[in-house]
């Protein structure tokens, strides 16, 4: 196959989206944008990106940020392990590299939360190093370009695709080339629905287009079944209109975040909820059920039963705090898993 870079780059320079991390592709900006975009659409991530940079304009500021403020800045993006790893990496960068990301692929790859793709994106876009940056968009483009039925989630197949990506990469324009492939996958060689082949600069070279197989590609491994878990959520409110929050363990699902009272693995009745509250030293003065809800994590699906409970004034149990509606809005971060109950909390 002839080299795709000339046609691809010509298309990219004419059609690329104007994005703040392209206008200023400094290492910190590219890093932050790539972490945010791992599980979030560009349009949804941009307001968070701007707000985050306004609050934490450089790596030392990120490294020094208090945990609750950091979580609040990330609130709404979900997958909070991303921002925890971001801060861990920032602290290492401050300790080992003087607060500046290293211009070295392997050193970037060694930082928490930075995998092959993110290291490649930073190294090629910010430091102009000739390395690959292969994400799902790029794998889809090359799967169709070569009409390759390989399962792209398999490491050996991904390595083979990466080698093909590098065969076409112009070393002097590695960052633009990598971004152009990602942009082509995001805007033209799209994942859902028919690819927009009539807009594609590589259409004349695309083997899947000729074979009529573009809609069938790429091939992925079948996803693992999620575990269904019953959960009981309790919005306990005292006479001062404060809600009881508990902090999750520092490791595991939603690590370190705040949540309403929660019992995992159990769908409790109203009587059982009152008994549990009384065991915590909280008098149950009134209880009403809330609509059932569910939340899907990557490997678990919570089926939530909810209750709104009025309780007598008391000290917060160990690991819990009382929070006013104002504090809930400005200080504490509740994960999106509790979206169905946030209106009741005044959020």
Regions of interest found by a model, annotated:
Residues 1-18, 23, 186-347:
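Intrinsically disordered, low-complexity, charged terminal extensions of DNA damage-control enzymes
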Residues 2-198, 202-211, 215, 283, ...:
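Catalytic cores of DNA base-excision repair glycosylases
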């Amino acid at each position: 196959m002839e080299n795709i870079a000339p046609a691809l780059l010509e298309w990219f320079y004419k059609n690329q989206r104007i994005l703040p991390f392209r206008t200023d592709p400094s290492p910190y900006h590219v890093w932050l944008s790539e972490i945010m975009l791992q599980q979030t659409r560009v349009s949804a991530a941009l307001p968070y990106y701007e707000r985050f940079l306004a609050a934490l304009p450089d790596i030392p500021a990120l490294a020094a940020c208090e945990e609750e403020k950091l979580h609040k800045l990330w609130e709404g993006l979900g997958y909070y392990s991303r921002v925890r790893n971001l801060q861990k990496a920032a602290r290492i960068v401050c300790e080992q590299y003087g607060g500046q990301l290293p211009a070295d692929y392997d050193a970037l790859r060694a930082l928490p939360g930075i995998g092959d793709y993110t290291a490649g994106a930073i190294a090629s876009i910010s430091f102009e190093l000739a390395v690959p940056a292969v994400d799902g968009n790029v794998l889809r483009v090359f799967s169709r370009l070569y009409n390759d039925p390989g399962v792209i989630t398999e490491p050996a197949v991904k390595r083979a695709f990466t080698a093909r990506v590098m065969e076409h990469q112009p070393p002097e324009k590695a960052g633009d080339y990598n971004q152009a492939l990602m942009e082509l996958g995001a805007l033209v060689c799209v994942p859902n629905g028919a690819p927009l082949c009539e807009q594609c600069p590589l259409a004349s070279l695309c083997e899947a287009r000729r074979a009529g197989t573009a809609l069938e590609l790429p091939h992925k491994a079948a996803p693992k079944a999620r575990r269904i878990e019953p959960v009981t959520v309790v919005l306990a409110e005292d006479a001062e209109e404060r809600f009881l929050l508990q902090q999750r363990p520092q490791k595991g699902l939603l690590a370190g975040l705040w949540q309403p009272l929660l019992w995992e693995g159990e769908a409790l009745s109203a009587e059982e909820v009152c008994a549990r509250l009384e065991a915590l030293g909280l008098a149950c003065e009134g209880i009403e059920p809330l609509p059932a809800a569910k939340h899907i994590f990557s490997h678990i699906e919570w089926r939530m039963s909810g209750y709104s409970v009025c309780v007598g004034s008391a000290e917060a149990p160990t690991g819990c705090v009382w929070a006013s509606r104002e504090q809930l809005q400005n200080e504490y971060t509740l994960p999106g898993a509790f979206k169905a109950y946030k209106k009741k909390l005044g959020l």
